UniProtKB/Swiss-Prot annotation:
Gene3D superfamilies, per database record: Zinc finger, CCCH-type
One GO molecular-function entry: RNA binding
Family annotation (PANTHER family): CLEAVAGE AND POLYADENYLATION SPECIFICITY FACTOR SUBUNIT 4, CLEAVAGE AND POLYADENYLATION SPECIFICITY FACTOR SUBUNIT 4-RELATED
Protein name (record): mRNA 3'-end-processing protein yth1
UniProt-listed GO biological process terms: mRNA processing
Species lineage: Eukaryota, Fungi, Dikarya, Ascomycota, Pezizomycotina
Keywords, ordered alphabetically: Metal-binding, mRNA processing, Nucleus, Repeat, RNA-binding, Zinc, Zinc-finger
Family (UniProt): Belongs to the CPSF4/YTH1 family.
Zinc finger (C3H1-type): 41-68, 91-113, 114-142, 143-170, 172-194
Composition bias, Basic residues: 246-255
Record-linked SMART domains: ZnF_C3H1
Length: 255
C-alpha cells in the first residue's frame, strides 16, 4: 500500500503542474451560473440589453445580469481598493474563516472591514463580549449612540465636554461659510446647518462605576432568569406536561 502511495506522489511531483484552485468542478455550478448568474468572472461585461430592460437570451446570455441589490454603488472600497465583484458592500463570512474556495471569483468582499460588519448583539445588550478583541462584529460604545450636538455643529457649544450630546470634530468648510461651496454634498468638510431656535443644551449625567456594575448585574440576572424559564418550559414539553394536564376529569356514565 505504501509503495502505491509513493508511486502516486512521485507522479504528481513529476508532472510539475499545480492544480488550479478553481471551484468549477462542482456539479451545481452550471445551474447557479445559468439560473442566477453567480460565479461569473469579474471581467464579464454587463448585458446592455438587460440594462435597458429586457434580454431575449434570458439565463442563457453569456453576459452578467445583475439585480439592483447586487449592483455596487461605489467604485472603491473603504480600503481604497476596487471591489472584487458585484457584492462589494458585504464581507464574505467564509473569507473571515479562511474557508472561501472562490478566491477572486467570489461575489463578496474579501477584506476585514469592521465598518461593514453587523453590530455585536452580546456587546450591545450587556456591554460585554466573551470574544473580546477577537470578535468579528462591531462593538459600538454608548457614547457613539448619542445624537450629535447641534450647537457644536454650528461652531460652539457652551457646555463643552459636559454636554449630554456627542461632539463630532469636523472642520467647517470655509467656502460654505463664505456663501458657496463648489463641492456640494461631496465636500470633505462640514456644511453647518443654521437652524433657528435650537433647544438649550443639557449637562451630561455621568454614571458611577458602581451604578454601571449594578446595571450589568441586573442584565445578567435577567438573562439567567430567561434561560431558566426556557429550560423549565423545555423540560415540561419533554415530560409531556401541558397547561391542563391532570386537571380535567370527565363525567362517567350514569352520573
Amino acid at each position: 500500500m505504501s509503495a502505491e502511495v509513493s508511486h502516486a506522489a512521485s507522479q504528481i511531483l513529476a508532472s510539475g503542474s499545480e492544480r488550479d484552485p478553481s471551484y468549477n468542478d462542482f456539479s451545481f455550478i452550471p445551474f447557479l451560473r445559468n439560473s442566477f448568474g453567480f460565479g461569473l468572472a469579474c471581467d464579464v461585461p454587463v448585458c446592455k440589453a438587460y440594462s435597458e430592460g429586457h434580454c431575449p437570451l434570458g439565463p442563457a446570455c453569456p453576459d452578467r445580469h445583475p439585480t439592483p441589490s447586487r449592483v455596487t454603488t461605489s467604485t472603491t472600497t473603504a480600503s481604497g481598493l476596487a471591489p472584487s465583484t458585484t457584492h462589494g458592500s458585504l464581507v464574505c463570512k467564509h473569507f473571515l474563516k479562511g474557508l472561501c474556495k472562490k478566491g477572486l471569483k467570489c461575489e463578496y468582499l474579501h477584506e476585514y472591514n469592521l465598518r461593514r460588519m453587523p453590530e455585536c448583539q452580546s456587546f450591545s445588550r450587556s456591554g460585554y463580549c466573551p470574544n473580546g478583541d477577537d470578535c468579528l462584529y462591531q462593538h459600538v460604545r454608548e457614547q457613539a449612540r448619542l445624537p450629535p450636538c447641534e450647537h457644536y455643529d454650528r461652531g460652539f457649544c457652551p457646555l463643552g465636554p459636559l454636554c449630554a450630546k456627542r461632539h463630532v470634530r469636523r472642520r467647517l468648510c470655509q467656502y460654505y461659510l463664505a456663501g458657496f461651496c463648489p463641492e456640494g454634498k461631496g465636500c470633505a468638510d462640514a456644511h453647518a446647518r443654521w437652524i433657528e431656535n435650537l433647544p438649550k443644551p443639557s449637562i451630561r449625567v455621568e454614571k458611577t462605576e458602581e451604578e454601571l456594575e449594578r446595571e450589568r448585574i441586573l442584565i445578567r440576572e435577567e438573562q439567567e432568569r430567561e434561560k431558566e424559564r426556557e429550560r423549565e418550559w423545555r423540560s415540561e414539553r419533554g415530560r409531556g406536561g401541558g397547561f391542563m394536564r391532570g386537571r380535567f376529569r370527565g363525567r362517567g356514565r350514569g352520573l
